[in-house]
Amino acid sequence: RQMCIRDSGNAHAEGYTESPWLDKTCRTKQQIYLADEDTLIRISGYRTRQSHYIMYMAACIFSLGIIGLLSLWFPRWRLRYVYQEADFADAEFVVVENQWGDISKEAFMSVPFARPLKSVFPPTSRDPPCTYAEAQSMLHDAVPDEIRCGHDGEEIVDLLMFEYRYTRFLLHPPTGRFRTIREWRDGKWTSTDLMRQGISTELERERRVFFGLNVIDIAEKSSLDLLISEVLHPFYIFQIVSILLWSLDDYYYYAFCIATISIGSIVSTLFETKKTIARMREMNRFVCSVRVLRDSQWRYLDSSDLMPGDVFDAAEQSLTTVPADCILLSGDAIVNESMPVS
């Protein structure tokens, strides 16, 4: 598939315009423009062809793993021959592709919910934009009445979702397409007086299911996973084959030197990667104590327990960092290079 991009690396491009990606009724493919990241992504649902999977495993065994190694380096081959496209509701996983052609396989999370549909998808909810132009038009367009008033009595049994680069996508059952959690808005957020009431503990538990914790928790691969991914890199596979060939020709000194250098490089890369991930986790994970209005009572909670709709005391002396994106309901604050906000 070719991408027609006006400017290299620019998500404002007119590319990604061919159907069925822009078809709002398609349940196997979907294109979404992420305004916060200025990125276009394409989502496709897949499930396994059992007969093709059996043949693929047999080919891996008879080729001594060469077929499996090639499918690791060229994942599109495996997608084409082992899996088939499926509706999102019936898919085993999704593949996300950005405008630069990078693909990522993301697993589904299915969570028992048994709540009204409008608790996750409020009446103002709608499909995310497919292009930059559509995103700009949605900023000024009102939500259509058929979207605003539809599906009030419907309930969700299981909530189907996945995460891509720490953005959560939820499957909207009536349309069979994904919507981003960041576009969620409480229907009661119509005035500051209603927003000052905060939320209850029951509502916090309900929202925790699809929002998760208020913390950026960067996933950390195990040392074994990092080691395997490093060893299976094409460069090191070439080195391993070279060592075997030199050993067969009795060039043991050459083989030993190359093996020593390769092992040292792999171990060094492993430690450096682990160190970098640990540093990123430490920089991004922030938790502090916050004074929160919960069940009409003020109490101290961890900032990781904050949910959309919570009201917290920003004037608390111990609070030196704002723990979440928020709206100032009363008072004044100095932020962003001493710019006053009221």
Model-derived regions, located:
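Eukaryotic mixed-charge, acidic/polar low-complexity intrinsically disordered regions
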Residues: 303-305
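Non-lumenal N-terminal regulatory segments of integral membrane proteins
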Residues: 2, 6-298, 307, 312, ...
